[in-house]
């Protein structure tokens, strides 16, 4: 008997594996430090706005997320008509791939880039082309060397997850200048709110002055609205028009829209998170380096640490040791970083516990 067969290439896609979600155990506190979630939660104003939506759950949302687009426009100085909102920036990444990629096309991503990129590429029948990195950092020349007449899209996470590295805005502009004009450059700025480097820019200037570059962002990270799945894209009118033609008519919920509007207006809550992140990013890097671990310099709300390959001291050993103590980090074998763990910057308590636990782990004979 025959059965339905997926399109060619679908079963070749490795499913996305999220960070572990710990199972609570009686008598033990568990800290989830595997998914880059904020330890502060959402703004209280966002929570209040979310609760207010409970009185209107029978209503369809406004289909274009107009109020949220206008709030984003005010916050960033953007034209709301050039903004699209989605169920997380993940949905928008998939919409872009669905709009611009098909069989015979190629999309380029960096060696340790976000795993949604190859999934979105392959799901649309296109070829995923990987550009090598330099010191776990996007290499513009490597990307440009991979361009062929079949290249239709380039994914650029800046800063990048899971490495925590970034490239200066001058390098982003050099990349755009080196790409053919028909290639869409996607600037994924999910972690932009945590970057304090003077040579970094989110990319608004580039999007505003070209017709082939888009910027995506999310409310899941610094705004703490990950469970609501809400994100956005700023792009040229031609790309916005094309993507809107296949976007679902009610793809963001009323609770998500209202919470996001309140979140983007609460700049004090965002600033608090930034200060906490910067303080602990420096401290954790220093402490882990003292233990003999190699820590990749990060500009995000997480740190990437590399472990020895010696039996008993590997990343897998450390992961098991920490998990038994209720400290859940992210193993990165699926990112081809089998000797590394990524730690979300958590509460003061969680961070201190990880330092103490890794100190004990590294001191073991």
Curated annotation (Swiss-Prot):
One of its GO terms (biological process) is L-histidine biosynthetic process. The keyword Ribonucleoprotein does not apply. The keyword Amino-acid biosynthesis applies. CDD domains: AAT_like (cd00609). GO terms for molecular function: histidinol-phosphate transaminase activity; pyridoxal phosphate binding. Its cofactor is pyridoxal 5'-phosphate. The modification N6-(pyridoxal phosphate)lysine is found at residue 221. Keywords: Amino-acid biosynthesis, Aminotransferase, Histidine biosynthesis, Pyridoxal phosphate, Transferase. It holds the Pfam family Aminotran_1_2. It catalyses: L-histidinol phosphate + 2-oxoglutarate = 3-(imidazol-4-yl)-2-oxopropyl phosphate + L-glutamate. Homodimer. Belongs to the class-II pyridoxal-phosphate-dependent aminotransferase family. Histidinol-phosphate aminotransferase subfamily. HAMAP family: HisC_aminotrans_2 (MF_01023). This is Histidinol-phosphate aminotransferase. It comes from Rhodopseudomonas palustris (strain HaA2).
């Amino acid at each position: 008997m025959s059965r339905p067969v997926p399109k060619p290439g679908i079963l070749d896609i490795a499913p996305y594996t999220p960070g572990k979600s710990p199972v609570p155990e009686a008598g033990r506190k568990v800290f989830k430090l595997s998914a880059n979630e904020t330890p502060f939660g959402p703004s209280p104003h966002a929570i209040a706005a979310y609760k207010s939506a409970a009185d209107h759950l029978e209503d369809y949302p406004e289909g274009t997320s107009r109020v949220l687009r206008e709030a984003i426009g005010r916050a960033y100085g953007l034209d709301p008509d050039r903004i699209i909102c989605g169920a997380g920036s993940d949905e928008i990444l998939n919409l872009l791939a669905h709009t611009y990629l098909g069989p015979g096309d190629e999309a380029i991503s960096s060696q340790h880039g976000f795993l949604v990129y190859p999934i979105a590429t392959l799901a649309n029948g296109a070829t995923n082309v990987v550009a090598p990195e330099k010191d776990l950092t996007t290499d513009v020349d490597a990307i440009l060397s991979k361009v062929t007449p079949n290249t239709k899209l380039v994914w650029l996470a800046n800063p990048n997850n899971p490495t925590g590295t970034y490239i200066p805005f001058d390098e982003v502009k050099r990349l755009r200048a080196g790409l053919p004009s028909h290639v869409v450059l996607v600037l994924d700025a999910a972690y932009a709110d945590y970057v304090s480097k003077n040579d970094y820019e989110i990319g608004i200037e580039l999007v505003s002055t070209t017709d082939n570059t888009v910027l995506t962002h999310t409310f899941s990270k610094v705004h703490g609205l990950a469970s609501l799945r809400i994100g956005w894209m700023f792009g040229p009118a031609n790309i916005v028009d094309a993507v809107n033609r296949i976007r679902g008519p009610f793809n963001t919920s009323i609770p998500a829209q209202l919470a996001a509007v309140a979140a983007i207006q609460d700049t004090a809550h965002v600033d608090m998170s930034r200060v906490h992140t910067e303080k602990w990013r420096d401290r954790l890097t220093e402490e882990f380096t003292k233990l003999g671990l190699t820590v990749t310099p990060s500009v995000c709300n997480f740190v990437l640490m590399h472990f020895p390959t010696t039996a008993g001291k590997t990343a897998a050993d450390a992961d098991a040791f920490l998990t038994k103590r209720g400290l859940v980090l992210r193993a990165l074998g699926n990112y081809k970083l089998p000797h590394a763990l990524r730690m979300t910057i958590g509460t003061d308590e969680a961070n201190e516990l990880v330092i103490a636990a890794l100190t004990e782990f590294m001191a073991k004979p």
